[in-house]
Amino acid sequence: MALSYKEKLIECIDNELQNGGTLLLLTNNNVVSEISYYGNGYKYFTFNTNHDLISQEELKGATSNNIARMIYNWIMKNPQNNKIWNGEPQTRIYFENNVYHTNYNHECIKDFWEVSTKVGPCIFNDRSIWCTKCTTFYPFSNILSPNMLE
């Protein structure tokens, strides 16, 4: 039986967490929180819009699947404004309901560019976007140049 959109997205987030690295949660293109794996568990950080640390806590007993479900619920609260950017190994970014997919054209490309320039340089290398319509990742490397956004 095919996985639902919700199950697919939770599975993808879960896989990213299991592969180590950092998940940055963005609202209106500002990083508002971060979940990172530190050897024996996960830590959760929250930030203000200037990226100043507000708080941090250890997520004791949390599993990657628990966290993936928490993130999914966080996205669903306000899907038009929430995004997830995966840090090291920095391979994927997820866009929610405001994305559509037609012949490998994504409306979110311009938005992705704006987010990526805030998060770090050269983010177009080895990246992919989660497409809400085809429920799969579209490799960003197929896009010829950021100049297409101008």
Curated annotation (Swiss-Prot):
Family of this protein: Belongs to the asfivirus A151R family.
Source species, domain of life: Viruses
SUBUNIT field: Monomer. Homodimer. Interacts with protein B119L. Interacts with membrane protein E248R.
Cofactor(s) needed: Zn(2+)
Keyword Protein biosynthesis part of the UniProt annotation: no
Keyword DNA-binding: no
Primary role: May participate in a redox cascade for the formation of disulfide bonds in viral proteins.
Keywords: Early protein, Metal-binding, Zinc
Record's protein name: Protein A151R
Induction record: Expressed in the early phase of the viral replicative cycle.
GO molecular function: metal ion binding
Cofactor, free-text remark: Binds 1 Zn(2+) ion.
